């Protein structure tokens, strides 16, 4: 398979966002906070900060890249884009509390979500909240917000997984907490 001589992806840096690059460690500061990510596992890749007439941009590039390195360039550029979106707007996941017979009670206690009376169970089910994420319960909705897309997504997945029904017909036992909307918080 032929190697590409030069592969590059550009990510624009908007006003009010500060990006610093130390080798393969990228730090993004914005109005909502600061995110740092280490890409040192990505060999043969260069991350640098450039400036042109349109403003600042982060360039992720590689020379003589095979298919794996090409994919890695795009992945790292997407991660940096998500970091910039996170510190400017943030991310929000919305989950719906669904129950048919036993009324489910959902409470936030410190760094965990406690789900009580799920399918009439005596013991509460517990889902972990990742660091830097806020969880709010409003009637039948659970709102998960934060600046790190991976932490927000993992927290929402933890809540959804905690209410998984095993050994029963999913068409009959529809109880659970389900993700129904995800996106940018604004």
From Swiss-Prot:
<dbReference type="InterPro" id="IPR019907">
    <property type="entry name" value="Ribosomal_uL6_arc"/>
</dbReference>
<comment type="subunit">
    <text>Part of the 50S ribosomal subunit.</text>
</comment>
<dbReference type="GO" id="GO:0022625">
    <property type="term" value="C:cytosolic large ribosomal subunit"/>
</dbReference>
<comment type="similarity">
    <text>Belongs to the universal ribosomal protein uL6 family.</text>
</comment>
<dbReference type="InterPro" id="IPR000702">
    <property type="entry name" value="Ribosomal_uL6-like"/>
</dbReference>
<dbReference type="GO" id="GO:0002181">
    <property type="term" value="P:cytoplasmic translation"/>
</dbReference>
<keyword id="KW-0699">rRNA-binding</keyword>
<keyword id="KW-0689">Ribosomal protein</keyword>
<keyword id="KW-0694">RNA-binding</keyword>
<dbReference type="InterPro" id="IPR002359">
    <property type="entry name" value="Ribosomal_uL6_CS2"/>
</dbReference>
<dbReference type="InterPro" id="IPR020040">
    <property type="entry name" value="Ribosomal_uL6_a/b-dom"/>
</dbReference>
<keyword id="KW-0687">Ribonucleoprotein</keyword>
<dbReference type="GO" id="GO:0003735">
    <property type="term" value="F:structural constituent of ribosome"/>
</dbReference>
<dbReference type="GO" id="GO:0019843">
    <property type="term" value="F:rRNA binding"/>
</dbReference>
<dbReference type="Pfam" id="PF00347">
    <property type="entry name" value="Ribosomal_L6"/>
</dbReference>
<comment type="function">
    <text>This protein binds to the 23S rRNA, and is important in its secondary structure. It is located near the subunit interface in the base of the L7/L12 stalk, and near the tRNA binding site of the peptidyltransferase center.</text>
</comment>
<protein>
    <recommendedName>
        <fullName>Large ribosomal subunit protein uL6</fullName>
    </recommendedName>
</protein>
<dbReference type="InterPro" id="IPR036789">
    <property type="entry name" value="Ribosomal_uL6-like_a/b-dom_sf"/>
</dbReference>
């Amino acid at each position: 398979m032929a190697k590409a001589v030069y592969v590059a992806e550009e990510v624009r840096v908007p006003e009010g966002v500060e990006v610093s690059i130390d080798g393969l460690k990228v730090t993004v500061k914005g109005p909502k906070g600061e995110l740092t990510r280490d890409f040192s596992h990505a060999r043969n890749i260069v991350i640098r900060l450039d400036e042109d007439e349109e403003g600042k941009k982060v360039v992720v590039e590689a020379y003589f890249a095979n298919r794996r390195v090409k994919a890695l360039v795009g992945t790292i550029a997407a991660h940096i884009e998500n970091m910039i979106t996170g510190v400017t707007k943030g991310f929000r996941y919305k989950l719906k509390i669904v129950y048919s017979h036993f009324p489910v009670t959902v409470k936030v206690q410190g760094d965990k979500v406690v789900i009580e009376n799920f399918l009439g169970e005596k013991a509460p089910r517990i889902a972990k909240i990742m660091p830097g994420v806020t969880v709010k319960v409003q009637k039948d909705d659970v709102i998960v917000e934060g600046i790190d897309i991976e932490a927000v997504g993992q927290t929402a997945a933890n809540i959804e997984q905690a209410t998984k029904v095993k050994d029963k017909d999913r068409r009959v036992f529809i109880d659970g907490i389900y993700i129904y909307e995800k996106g940018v918080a604004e």
